Amino acid sequence: SPFTFVATVNAMLNAGATVRFVDIDPVTYCLDVSQVEAAITPATVAIAPVHLYGLAADMAPLMAIALRHSLAIIEDAAQAHGALYKGARVGSFGVGSFSFYATKNMTTGEGGMVTTNDDAVADRLRLLRNQGMRARYEYEMVGRNARMTDLQAAVGTAELEILPERIERRRANAAGLTEQLDDLET
């Protein structure tokens, strides 16, 4: 979806991908599932839904499309910490990416997290984040230093503990604002 922060697209471009945008649903601001299949080409390798403002993209039809075309799902959950889709956490449908930047619902000051239930992907990500090193001075690939510091981990742990309370407060605020807006004449 083009309705996201540039970092989403930068990650794809840095991986050598060609990005093909699909518009958003005007109600949810998430990927418009009805447009996805028409955008798929023989070169397509993944669908990258963006979960936005705590709202999950419509994952069931996206998963069906991905399965039908043998595509990966790479979720941008940077603005949806703790969000659910039919009882399942966003970031659990394929490879999920979360941002811990200071403006997010949960922060470590900077950085992020990748989630996956694919052991091979998890192994590769661990290598990439630690200079390509599997064991002390055993390097298997080119990597980078993308490790979280102990201080960031401590902040993140504290943030995780209060995340449910934050989410509930945001939901209550949204409900209150919606109620007030509903009273306005258009």
Walk through the language-model features, giving the residues of each:
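A secondary-structure boundary/capping signal
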Residues: 1-2, 77, 102, 117, ...
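Histidine-centered beta-alpha loop that forms part of the nucleotide-sugar donor binding/catalytic region
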Residues: 3-4, 17, 24, 78-79, ...
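Conserved active-site segment immediately N-terminal to the catalytic lysine
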Residues: 75-107, 135-140
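Active-site-proximal alpha-helical scaffold in enzymes
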Residues: 109-116
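PLP-dependent aminotransferase class I/II
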Residues: 34, 46-50, 55, 59-61, ...
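PLP-dependent aminotransferase-like
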Residues: 1-77, 84
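Nucleotide-sugar-dependent glycosyltransferase donor-binding/catalytic pocket residues
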Residues: 5, 29, 54-55, 102-108, ...
